Amino acid sequence: MPTLAAILHTLDPFIVQFTPSFGLRWYGLLYASGLLCAWMIMRAVARRGRAGLTQRQVDDFITEVVIGVVVGARLGHALIYDRVLFTTFTPSFPFWELLAVHKGGLSSHGGMAGLLVVCWRFARRSGASFRTLLDLCCISAPPGLCLGRMANWINGELWGRPLPQDLQANAPWWCVKYPREVFEPSFDPSRLEPLRPLVHAGDDLQQAVVAAAYAGDAKVQAALEPLLTAFWPSNFFQAFTDGPVLAVVVWIVWLRRPAPGVATASFLVAYGLLRFITEQFREPDAGVNTLLGLTSPMLISVSMVVCGVVMAGRCRAAYRTVRDGSTGGS
């Protein structure tokens, strides 16, 4: 019985390309779309009087959120996954690799840390409730998190783990294969020799095969696909859990009008648990530290769950104290 082919990643990260390394990318467009969604949600909540901010204040707040998220996400990526970015300089713009955000490399954990700083600063300056601002951000974040994972997919980054060996020979239709695997040290380039007649290859057969595959050459794609490893579609898993699933959890909590900060606590617990689960299917980045078999993202996710549980308890206790005090004084 014939089976559907695996998902072969041949997406172009550029929408419009001006030079080999510069152009309008899907990565940036999707991140901008996520922030636009957050702004629209915040304004809608403000119109209903539950944001703790006016609509004009929301406009000021989202501007700072954009800066905080991008800076935090980039620094988080460099600290957790790729510290060499701090010391790498190039002759081309933007000269310092840490600033080369257009190439990808934004950490969701880092973005959340940046968001925390923004909420704290804005609350102190405006007099708004810090916990209410956090809640506002948490109910607005899932669309951006989902789109961020799809941006990772289009960029061909953050691969999943290889499927078990017994599934490699007859890989299921939902698995993902990456032509760029031929550049990995573990891939034997001699396996590509049967494809040489299909491409215009000089000395660099690997580059020619990958270029043809991404250019849409069906014959090259068909010949290359069986040679590639089948990976878990971790980008899709995390897009689903970080987006629709997380949104449902946080919005159910928020719509019940809990104490300020409880929606944030539910976000921390839900995101931490979901991220920990989906990280089991994601290939750890090279150089990422591990402790007791857990990668840095897993450890951070566990910390988020613990912080969420503690925060929920403290928020409810503080809310009861205020409520009882108000009742007693009436």
Model-found features: residue ranges?
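A feature for loop-to-transmembrane-helix boundaries and adjacent hydrophobic helices
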Residues: 1-330
